[in-house]
Amino acid sequence: MNPLQLLQPLPAEIKGTKLLAHWDSGATITCIPESFLEDEQPIKKTLIKTIHGEKQQNVYYVTFKVKGRKVEAEVIASPYEYILLSPTDVPWLTQQPLQLTILVPLQEYQEKILSKTALPEDQKQQLKTLFVKYDNLWQHWENQVGHRKIRPHNIATGDYPPRPQKQYPINPKAKPSIQIVIDDLLKQGVLTPQNSTMNTPVYPVPKPDGRWRMVLDYREVNKTIPLTAAQNQHSAGILATIVRQKYKTTLDLANGFWAHPITPESYWLTAFTWQGKQYCWTRLPQGFLNSPALFTADVVDLLKEIPNVQVYVDDIYLSHDDPKEHVQQLEKVFQILLQAGYVVSLKKSEIGQKTVEFLGFNITKEGRGLTDTFKTKLLNITPPKDLKQLQSILGLLNFARNFIPNFAELVQPLYNLIASAKGKYIEWSEENTKQLNMVIEALNTASNLEERLPEQRLVIKVNTSPSAGYVRYYNETGKKPIMYLNYVFSKAELKFSMLEKLLTTMHKALIKAMDLAMGQEILVYSPIVSMTKIQKTPLPERKALPIRWITWMTYLEDPRIQFHYDKTLPELKHIPDVYTSSQSPVKHPSQYEGVFYTDGSAIKSPDPTKSNNAGMGIVHATYKPEYQVLNQWSIPLGNHTAQMAEIAAVEFACKKALKIPGPVLVITDSFYVAESANKELPYWKSNGFVNNKKKPLKHISKWKSIAECLSMKPDITIQHEKGISLQIPVFILKGNALADKLATQGSYVVNCNTKKPNLDAELDQLLQGHYIKGYPKQYTYFLEDGKVKVSRPEGVKIIPPQSDRQKIVLQAHNLAHTGREATLLKIANLYWWPNMRKDVVKQLGRCQQCLITNASNKASGPILRPDRPQKPFDKFFIDYIGPLPPSQGYLYVLVVVDGMTGFTWLYPTKAPSTSATVKSLNVLTSIAIPKVIHSDQGAAFTSSTFAEWAKERGIHLEFSTPYHPQSGSKVERKNSDIKRLLTKLLVGRPTKWYDLLPVVQLALNNTYSPVLKYTPHQLLFGIDSNTPFANQDTLDLTREEELSLLQEIRTSLYHPSTPPASSRSWSPVVGQLVQERVARPASLRPRWHKPSTVLKVLNPRTVVILDHLGNNRTVSIDNLKPTSHQNGTTNDTATMDHLEKNE
């Protein structure tokens, strides 16, 4: 509109009343006569500024018309009788042609659609006219956004606000594309520069055309947002129910989410940072939890009156048989979308075609199939190099899982790689490549699937194999499947009978069928002749839990489901009869090298505190060829059940069978034991010996032992034979009868069985009166309650066997990991034996937890006194102090100390960098170049740049050992002096230290050393500086006298001798086991690393070790302690490895 026309009154209408409106360029909000707002509810309050001052006013959200065009906006009450319009509410009044960055070739897209359409010529011309008529509907620019005039969405959070997130590193190639998007959205008001307490990282995603899509990671925000109850229908359900008529159209709404406004109170949640500046969304952002549901609900509501339309997020599908009707309905859709404020992308749209692409599939009149684009992606798949690539490939394959009947079985080996992956690495083999190619070939040759006809009943055909179930869905009159379903049985389901596996598959099929039935009956065809008869399946034949059987049986009562037996599917008939069981033919015992007959028995115990007395009997026999008993055992077991006795007898026989070469037969009369050993034991072993309720099995130790024996000797056969029966062979009857007799004897003698004391040879001789070294003769030794005891002055003590002494010490020590004396006193309460203290010390030295936690009980050797350089400037010690409080832009101070004189130079720097170090030392080396520079291992001193600088000047670099400041004690001492002096001089003004550095340097260089009795200035120049308290006699000396005095001072320097070594000190040797101190141990964490080997001794106080990470490191012995076990003791570091995992 011409700007002059804006000065004229504009026709308006509100609530059916016509009035005038005036465009006000200075208005920030539209003003409505207050009489029209009496029945409205305010949505908030806002502060209004006018020439008369500021005032809080109610804000309303109303709908009115301007020049016949609908306007929805926030307004306030006005005392005038006309409307004052804010320019932001009617932007179309002054609308200029949109100018963004990248122009879309719209004409090219329209010609492409017209060339591919299947519409007759008349309708094609009508479509061409529609392109011109609705030009404002099409997307002319990339990143062009519509403007949906609806009440803004409010993004509500839960009880806790989201936490701001850091920005990820961004690929530099993505920055130009993202910058274009942000610039275009700023021009359209979709983004606004605004600071926020929230931040979401930008995550650019590459597009196929080489550009990048701007995606925001809103996962942290989504955690705090309540999920909208109304959610989108699943794409599979839409594909199964869409109308497939002759002419089909798909429309793509461009940037649909960005057309929906949000309330200003929600802006802060959407904030992100780009190029150091923060932006917020004024529209519904992509990636927000409820964006798809809110957007789809709006589009569905707009198009609800249009027949044969289906909406999935920003994709619109419609289909009709009549071309005229199709074009008429298309125009209605165009008109609705334009009035609503949406923009349509013709690049991704297909109009009036017989086959269109919708939701990733080719949609035809008969059904759906895989697109050429998808098949091309399959052919471009290469073997994955890591876990992420494998998951991406499986995600792509899973998209088409319903197109082949055995998809789950084909991809199962690939999914197994995910479970066995080590971090992000996978073990990909040639077999995996073949399997992947097999899946790709099957998908590329897959046929189209038929559409679901809602007026027909749904047919399900079910089949099963030992490892998987197969399902096909049909329309009642259909010839092609609607979809396939393949289900791989779990470990628990693999143990089911074939009938139960078929019922499991049927259950999975019916869950999916409820979505596909669309209110129609479901016809299930299976190899089961009569579903009602399966209820009579005997309990011993049921492997599944009762709850599963209850679920399966409920389908019999569902009136929507009918079960049929399909005679046309012979491959589905072969299911084992659940009423019969197959048994392997019994071999004659002469075919085995040995035969064990086992039995268990239990009687009621006469002891009221016990329930049973159990015993087991085992007979070892052979047939050469006659029956001959080689050995027999009758063993009491105590208070146990007969079942436990049966299992223990089989375990005993299996252990004895390990010593026999060749096949061995173990016969038991317990059906439970034989069936469990032959059928259930492999599953128990694989799942950790737990039952279906994930609880440990009864008698788990026995079953583990039997499983171990069977794995060590696979030719052990465990066979069930009934007890005393006329139906069993005579050669088995004899062995069973004897084993039963022995088991009964064991159960009866258990009460009078006396346990023999556990004595070794030493204690046995002691009881016989022989003199044993270490046992005093004056004490009395006797046997009581199966234990050897000694009567000592402090009381009666138990003497344990030698094999038990280590366990006793460890048990006493592990209670609280006490020291030698505390552990010894605890043991001495009950026990005594010779050399008890020595055994305690030995075991404590092997406690891994104490080794890495206790402090060292040995001191390192005396401190080495490094030789003082003979001349000034031979050796410099350098280090950084800081960070200090900012002072004129400086934060750090480089300290340089001369090794011979202690003379100090101070250089302020802004950072402890290599460049700052080199710059400062270049000033100093203009006076003299040192031979050696000693420093710690900071980054500024160990960089290649600093090493190159030193090499060019012939300077040797020397470094302190880590975590050992004593190595650079000269400069460390100066650092403490500098900090102390600065603190005292800067009380109340810590940021003024830069100006005081010359004063501090002068003070340090003229301070007397209590040891040397001279100042650094005197040691360097031979005379005092011109400062207070200076020796005035030296100021008048001639140059010859100064040099003579300087030589006298330097030759008289006091060289302290090395102090003598402590009696508790230690010296390192090559090959010695030592433990390195943890630099900064966390609370309740070990203070020492696991033992390492000394590889080289550089000097009495510095060594090279192979550290706990496998690296050679130079360390000071001040940070080491010798390991307790050195000679002949195994360096078992398993415990310490476990404890150091999280260091």
From Swiss-Prot:
Tell me which Pfam families the record gives: Integrase_H2C2, RNase_H, RT_RNaseH_2, rve, RVT_1, SH3_11, Spuma_A9PTase
Site feature (Cleavage) residues = F596, Y597, N751, C752
Q: Which reaction does it catalyse?
A: Endonucleolytic cleavage to 5'-phosphomonoester; DNA(n) + a 2'-deoxyribonucleoside 5'-triphosphate = DNA(n+1) + diphosphate
Consequence of changing D24A = Complete loss of Gag processing and of Pol processing. Particles are non-infectious
Q: Which residues form the RNase H type-1 domain?
A: 590-748
- Residues of the region (Disordered) are 1117-1143
Where do Polar residues bias regions lie?
1117-1134
List GO BP terms, alphabetically: DNA integration; DNA recombination; establishment of integrated proviral latency; proteolysis; symbiont entry into host cell; viral genome integration into host DNA; viral penetration into host nucleus
Identify the PROSITE patterns for this entry: FV_PR, INTEGRASE, RNASE_H_1, RT_POL
GO molecular function terms noted in the UniProt entry: aspartic-type endopeptidase activity; DNA-directed DNA polymerase activity; metal ion binding; RNA binding; RNA-directed DNA polymerase activity; RNA-DNA hybrid ribonuclease activity
Listed binding positions for Mg(2+) 3 are D874, D936
**Span of domain Reverse transcriptase:** 198-363
Q: Which part of the chain is the Integrase catalytic domain?
A: 868-1024
Instruction: Give the matching InterPro entries.
Output: DNA/RNA_pol_sf, Integrase_cat-core, Integrase_H2C2, Peptidase_aspartic_dom_sf, Retrovirus_Pol_polyprotein, Rev_trsase/Diguanyl_cyclase, RNaseH-like_sf, RNaseH_domain
What does the entry list as the binding residues for Mg(2+) 1?
D252, D314, D315
Query: What does this protein need as cofactor?
Result: Mg(2+)
Gene Ontology CC: host cell; host cell cytoplasm; host cell nucleus; virion component
> What is annotated about its quaternary structure and interactions?
The protease is a homodimer, whose active site consists of two apposed aspartic acid residues.
Q: What is known of its domains?
A: The reverse transcriptase/ribonuclease H (RT) is structured in five subdomains: finger, palm, thumb, connection and RNase H. Within the palm subdomain, the 'primer grip' region is thought to be involved in the positioning of the primer terminus for accommodating the incoming nucleotide. The RNase H domain stabilizes the association of RT with primer-template. Integrase core domain contains the D-x(n)-D-x(35)-E motif, named for the phylogenetically conserved glutamic acid and aspartic acid residues and the invariant 35 amino acid spacing between the second and third acidic residues. Each acidic residue of the D,D(35)E motif is independently essential for the 3'-processing and strand transfer activities of purified integrase protein.
This molecule's function is given as:
The aspartyl protease activity mediates proteolytic cleavages of Gag and Pol polyproteins. The reverse transcriptase (RT) activity converts the viral RNA genome into dsDNA in the cytoplasm, shortly after virus entry into the cell (early reverse transcription) or after proviral DNA transcription (late reverse transcription). RT consists of a DNA polymerase activity that can copy either DNA or RNA templates, and a ribonuclease H (RNase H) activity that cleaves the RNA strand of RNA-DNA heteroduplexes in a partially processive 3' to 5' endonucleasic mode. Integrase catalyzes viral DNA integration into the host chromosome, by performing a series of DNA cutting and joining reactions. This enzyme activity takes place after virion entry into a cell and reverse transcription of the RNA genome in dsDNA. The first step in the integration process is 3' processing. This step requires a complex comprising at least the viral genome, matrix protein, and integrase. This complex is called the pre-integration complex (PIC). The integrase protein removes 2 nucleotides from the 3' end of the viral DNA right (U5) end, leaving the left (U3) intact.
The entry's protein name is: Pro-Pol polyprotein
Organism of this sequence = Human spumaretrovirus (SFVcpz(hu))
